[in-house]
């Protein structure tokens, strides 16, 4: 099982209401697998909209999974910081798929800094 498949299965098993994101390698597979294993998934027109929709789901006391590649979090940063200070009634999990070594992206950035700056919990997968 790949990391993307594990994220999708965990969201499904945890009873997430919606998985939403903007397609971009290396994060695209997460929502594809989430939909394939029975989760309700949708693509948004951009990363900001994806996070806004996910935030709305979490405001309604439901669980939302939001996926995007690392540069997409730049687009969604306003919403991320707003969510950090408003809080949510449900659950909001944001998966930012970084691309060390720029295998499929135009830049390399470390999005763990966003979590630190926003003061939100962060999980970092490891072997």
Model-flagged regions — what are they?
Residues 1-122, 126:
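Thiamine diphosphate
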